[in-house]
Structures are given as structure tokens and as C-alpha cells.
Design a protein with these regions (language model features):
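Tandem repeat scaffolds
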Residues: 2-10, 16, 20-300
Length: 300
């Protein structure tokens, strides 16, 4: 172990010199290395090669890994709190149970990766590209995921309270049973996403385009859909009490069994173009189905 540690120290020194653009330096190539349980807090490995590396239960808190290649690495349960992973290649990597609170992951490329049960609270994920990756059961409170692209990302059963997804494109992604009070999707596009049983109280969907998404059994009390474009969405048995719809374009929504009690700024055309039934509670508190010219679109 001492020999391995000494060798690693030499690699880190040479890498630091390489980053300074000195001819005496050498880029750290840690491909396939195993460094389980190592204390590497604050380590400088920016632009290093760690493909297929195994660092289980390691401490990399505050580490600088910006631009590093971590493809197919196994970092299960490791501590990356406050680490800089900006523009990293993370495809195929395993961060299951890892600590990434306050970490910087902006501009990272994440495909086929696993972040299940990871701690991502207050992480910065601006302009990331995520595809076919699992973020199930994560603690992602107050995560910032602005101007990113997510395809087939699974956030099911995660805590996304006060998460911010401004101007983000989400396609075929799953948010089933998430806790996401006050989550923000302002200016985003949600295409064929699943929010079944999601708790989205006070969520903000201002100027959001929502296409064929499922909110079945969801809690969207006081959600804000002003200026949104909502097309072909399933809100069956959802709770939309007190939700706002000012200037939104709402077409072909399924409100069967939905509670719209106290919903604000709904128009007769919105409800006339949507499905309602005898289980629907309309904005004025009356029972559905909605009948045009009944005035039931006006909340009490």
C-alpha cells in the first residue's frame, strides 16, 4: 500500500506540472486503477484519465476533477461533496450512494450512468446532457439543472424539493412518486414524461411546453401553469386545487376524476376541450362533467 501511495503521489505531482504546461509534466493516467477507501480530499486531477477506475468509499471532497474522464468508473459511496466535476465524461459511471452535495457537474456528459440514492442536494448541473441514466431515490433538494437536456432519465422516488430546471428539455423521463414541492420548470419543454403520484405542490410551470405527460394521481395543489402550452396530458385523479392557468393553452387534457377546486384563470374553452366526468371537481366546487356556459370554470 505504501508503494502504491508513493507512486500515486508522484503521478499527482507530475500531473500538476503538466497542467502548468511544463515539458517536465505528465498527464495523470489512472485508467483501471483501484483506490478504495483512499483519502483524496482536495486532490488536483483536472483533465485526468480515470476511465474504468474503482474508487469505492473514497474521499474526494473538494477535489478538482474538471474535464476529467471518468467513463465506466465505479465510485459507489464515495464522497464528492463540493468537488468540481465540470465538463467531465461520466458515461457508464456508477455513483450509487455517492455524496455529491454542492458539487459542480455543469456541462458534464452523462449517459448510461447510475446515481441511485446519491446525495445531490444543491449540486450545480447547468447545461448537462443526460441520457438513459438512473437518479432514483436521490436526495436532490435545491439542485440546479438549468438549460440541460435529459432523455430517458429516471428520477423516480427522489426528493426534488425546490429543484430548479429552468429552460431544460426533458424527454421520456420519469418522475414517479417524487417529492418535488416548489420545483421550477419555467421555460422548459416536457415531452412524454411520467409524473405519476408526484408531489408537486407549488411547482412552477410558467411558459413551459408540456406534451403528452402523465400526472396521474399527482398532487399539483397551487401549481402555476400561467403562459404554459399543455397538450394531451393525463391529469386523471390528480389534485390541482388552486392551480393557476392564466394565458395558458390547454388542449386535450384528461381531467377525469381530477380535483380542480379553486383553480384560477381557467376558461370555458379549456374545459370544453378537455375530458371531464362525474368524478371531476370543477373550479367552482361543483361536480362534473363540465357543461359549457355553466360558469363552473370560475373558482369560488
Amino acid at each position: 500500500m505504501l508503494q502504491a501511495t508513493t507512486s500515486l503521489a508522484g503521478i499527482l505531482r507530475a500531473h500538476k506540472v503538466w497542467l502548468e504546461k511544463s515539458a517536465d509534466g505528465r498527464r495523470a493516467n489512472l485508467h483501471g486503477i483501484t483506490l478504495n477507501d483512499q483519502d483524496l480530499h482536495g486532490v488536483l486531477l483536472s483533465r485526468a484519465i480515470l476511465t474504468n477506475a474503482t474508487l469505492l468509499d473514497a474521499n474526494l471532497s473538494g477535489a478538482n476533477l474538471a474535464g476529467a474522464q471518468l467513463d465506466n468508473g465505479d465510485f459507489e459511496r464515495s464522497n464528492f461533496a463540493g468537488a468540481d466535476l465540470t465538463a467531465c465524461e461520466l458515461s457508464g459511471a456508477n455513483f450509487g450512494g455517492a455524496w455529491l452535495s454542492n458539487a459542480a457537474l455543469s456541462e458534464a456528459s452523462i449517459r448510461g450512468a447510475c446515481f441511485r440514492r446519491a446525495k445531490l442536494s444543491r449540486a450545480q448541473m447547468l447545461e448537462v446532457t443526460i441520457a438513459e441514466s438512473s437518479f432514483r431515490e436521490c436526495d436532490a433538494r435545491a439542485i440546479n439543472c438549468h438549460q440541460s437536456r435529459l432523455f430517458d432519465a429516471d428520477w423516480s422516488e427522489s426528493d426534488l424539493t425546490q429543484a430548479q430546471f429552468y429552460h431544460t428539455r426533458l424527454q421520456s423521463s420519469r418522475f414517479t412518486s417524487v417529492i418535488a414541492e416548489s420545483m421550477i420548470f419555467t421555460g422548459s419543454k416536457l415531452d412524454h414524461c411520467d409524473f405519476t403520484r408526484a408531489q408537486l405542490e407549488d411547482a412552477r410551470f410558467l411558459r413551459t411546453e408540456i406534451v403528452q405527460c402523465c400526472f396521474h394521481d399527482g398532487r399539483l395543489i397551487r401549481a402555476d401553469f400561467r403562459d404554459a402550452k399543455i397538450r394531451g396530458c393525463d391529469f386523471t385523479r390528480a389534485m390541482l386545487d388552486g392551480a393557476r392557468f392564466g394565458n395558458s393553452q390547454l388542449t386535450m387534457a384528461d381531467f377525469r376524476g381530477t380535483s380542480l377546486r379553486g383553480a384560477r384563470e381557467m376558461s370555458a374553452d379549456m374545459l370544453a376541450q378537455s375530458l371531464t366526468d362525474h368524478r371531476t371537481i370543477l373550479p367552482n366546487g361543483s361536480q362534473g362533467p363540465y357543461r359549457k356556459f355553466s360558469g363552473a370554470e370560475h373558482g369560488r
